[in-house]
């Protein structure tokens, strides 16, 4: 990992400090601290993944954004374990807010913005090893701020113990901060990673959250009758400040490696053939569809004129589509979509 530049990226100018109430105050060093955490998370994940793969290494591209900001894109390809994967870090700022942000938070209009985050997608070679996604981010626009993120698992073959392990590890990280975090954000994850045009879940979920700030609301979306909306209404508002939520996000980020690596180690040696490989490529097509149609990070990146190669690094190197494909009844492939991907309480 020594070839990776660890020079700290510069914090943007004109950092607004909010002084309205103790619970909603933005620390003076909020941008520096959030940015540093995202960089460190990228470093830790890349180091561990290289050690696990044992063959391939991450290639880094450092890029700059003309409107303000820069980042580090790291891609691993043709490895022993990982066919392709990427771990991105970025910190961007500017005066023009993208439409995707204004649609959700119109009160941010008129303010310069700052956004930093780390995102990751790994596409393993072996179909028995699940694809995994992680994203944690922080956003500021004048007095408006929030954290978002999560991690989710997309298996191609059903292993209950893997799903339980992944969810339990994330739940443990959440429970340290609030026992209502996991049940709320698990439901939100099931809602978010859903392909409406296919009426299918993308995977077995994990946790997902967005717009987490001092307002106290755990679920911040327009739906009022979904499972997560109803659950969040029962929970009510949760008193938190910037430091509370930042600590929670750090715990979630640090839970990724113990949540995912044991699964890879259990499954990477299982033998597979053309049938399993073809099904993996077919299901990867669903991943492509979600990321290009629904993913907020993709939309935000393209609307803010981010680096296109970095934004689309989440896509797999190979995928396939087959007209009106139907898996054989009773097969492991049929079990995945008919049974295993249906939302449930894993822990």
Swiss-Prot record:
Region entry Disordered, spans: 1-31
Active site: residue positions: 133 (proton donor)
Record GO cellular component, one term: cytoplasm
Keywords: Cytoplasm, Oxidoreductase, Porphyrin biosynthesis
Pfam family, one: Coprogen_oxidas
Catalytic activity: coproporphyrinogen III + O2 + 2 H(+) = protoporphyrinogen IX + 2 CO2 + 2 H2O
Site features described as Important for dimerization, chain residue numbers: 197
Binding site for substrate: 119, 135-137, 305-310
Location within or outside the cell: Cytoplasm
GO MF, one annotated term: protein homodimerization activity
Biological process according to GO: chlorophyll biosynthetic process; protoporphyrinogen IX biosynthetic process
Family, as annotated: Belongs to the aerobic coproporphyrinogen-III oxidase family.
Assembly and interaction partners: Homodimer.
Protein name (record): Coproporphyrinogen-III oxidase, aerobic 2
Gene this protein is translated from: hemF2
């Amino acid at each position: 990992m020594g070839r990776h530049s660890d020079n700290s990226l510069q914090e943007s100018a004109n950092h607004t400090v909010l002084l309205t109430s103790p619970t909603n105050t933005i620390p003076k060093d909020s941008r520096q601290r959030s940015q540093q955490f995202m960089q460190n998370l990228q470093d830790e994940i890349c180091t561990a993944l290289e050690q696990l793969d044992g063959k391939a290494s991450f290639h880094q591209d450092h890029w700059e954004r003309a409107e303000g900001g820069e980042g580090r894109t790291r891609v691993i390809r043709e490895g022993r374990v990982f066919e392709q994967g990427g771990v991105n870090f970025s910190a961007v700022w500017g005066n023009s807010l993208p439409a995707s942000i204004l649609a959700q938070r119109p009160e941010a209009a008129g303010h310069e913005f700052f956004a930093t985050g780390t995102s990751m997608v790994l596409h393993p070679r072996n179909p028995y090893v699940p694809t995994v996604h992680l994203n944690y981010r922080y956003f500021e626009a004048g007095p408006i701020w929030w954290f978002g993120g999560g991690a989710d698992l997309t298996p191609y073959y059903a292993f209950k113990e893997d799903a339980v392990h992944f969810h339990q590890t994330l739940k443990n990280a959440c429970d340290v901060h609030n026992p209502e975090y996991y049940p709320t954000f698990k439901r939100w994850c099931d809602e978010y990673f859903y392909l409406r045009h296919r009426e299918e879940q993308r995977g077995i979920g994990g946790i997902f959250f967005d717009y987490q700030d001092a307002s106290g609301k755990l679920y911040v979306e327009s739906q009022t009758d979904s499972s997560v909306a109803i659950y969040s209404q029962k929970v009510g508002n949760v008193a938190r400040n910037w430091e509370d939520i930042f600590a929670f996000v750090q715990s979630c980020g640090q839970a990724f490696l113990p949540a995912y690596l044991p699964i890879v180690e259990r499954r990477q040696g299982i033998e597979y053939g053309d049938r399993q490989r073809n099904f993996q490529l077919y299901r990867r097509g669903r991943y492509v569809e979600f990321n290009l149609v629904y993913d907020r990070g993709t939309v935000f990146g393209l609307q803010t004129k981010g680096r296109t190669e970095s934004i689309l690094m989440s896509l797999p190197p190979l995928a396939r589509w087959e007209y009106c494909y139907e898996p054989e009844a009773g097969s492991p492939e049929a079990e995945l979509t008919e049974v295993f991907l249906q939302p449930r309480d894993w822990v």
